[in-house]
Structures are given as structure tokens and as C-alpha cells.
Amino acid sequence: MPESFKALIINQEGENFNREIKSIDKSFLKHGDVLVKVDYSSLNFKDALILKNGARLVKEFPHIPGIDFSGTVEESENDKFKPGDEIILTGWRVGEIFYGGYSQYAKVNGDFLVKKPKSLTSKQAMILGTAGFTALQCSFTTKTTREELLLGEKVENVIVTGASGGVGSIAVMILNKLGSNVTAVTGKESNKEYLKSIGAKNVINLSLIHI
């Protein structure tokens, strides 16, 4: 790996909050037993809050945000991974407590990582990212068991709120693919055609409902 690399660093000094892309070296990365060359990360709602002002989610500064990433193992002291393994990370408070994915290299606990499926490119994995993982987990809760979901047994009618957001959009796609009759709930009339194009059979516009 290079002697130095780029990372987005946030810092708080008194009332001053700043964000800056800086050159750092490996010694800056504090935690973990696996060093990853980061290919992609994504911008999640929690990331936006942290980038705005730390949102009380970050306790120590300076800090590298980014709650998910995909990439390739560069160095490993963890028996589960070896250099060259393609991995995905989402969650585990990475980007909050631990340094995150807005860096060309990340060092994390190997227990936080999973190997990337060969059916996805590194870029595709982060297009889905934390939002896709969350949507799939939410879809599990509509079934009796995870196995039923994977077998494709459908729930007849499902309402997805916040349907035009990252999690909601992917949930609409997943449930439509499984054969459910999806009703999407949104706050904007302009989202109607988009939601129908990704699989919603019905769209409820909350802005037109007066109670």
C-alpha cells in the first residue's frame, strides 16, 4: 500500500465543526485486525447527520465517517480473511465509534466483515449498501421464517412507508419481485410514477390526506 492515502476527516474544536479531505498514513487507523483497500462506500441518512455536525453520534474527534464500504483485503491478522478477499461491511457502528469507509483504506475488526458474493461487483454491493441490507431485513419480518422468504412464498398485501427513500425503494422492489401487492406511501405526488415503475401497484400520497 502507499505510504499515504486520502480520507475524509471530520473534526470538532469547541463550536467549530469542519470536514476536510486529508492525506494520512496507516498509523492514523486505530482499530482492527484487517486492513482493507476501500473500493466504494455510500451516503446513508446517518452519514448525512454525521457530516452535518456529528449529530452526537461521534464521540471522539478527529474521525473518519462512512457506515459501510466494500473493498479488498490488503493485510489480515484474522484467520477468516486473507489478502485479496473481496469484502463488504455494513453496521457495527463503524463510521460512528470506529473509523469508517470514507477513506481509501480502512482498518476494522474482521468479525465485522463478510465476503462479497461473486454475483455482485464491489460497486453493486454499495449501490445496495446499508439501505438494501435494511430493506431485506424488513422484508424478513413480513414472513414466518427467512426460509419462506427465500423460497419465494409471497405475502399478498404489503404497505411500504417512506417508499421513495433508499430503504423503502429497495423494499418495494424486493416485495414486488416476490409477488406481493405493494402499496407505497409517499409525501410527494411527483414520486408516484417512479414508485409504480419499481413495482408499486398502488401509491398513497400523504400530502393529499387531511385529518
Task: Report residues per predicted region.
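Residues located in well-ordered beta-strands
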Residues: 6, 20, 37, 70-72, ...
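Mid-domain Rossmann-like dinucleotide-binding core that forms the NAD(H)/NADP(H) cofactor-binding site
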Residues: 126-207
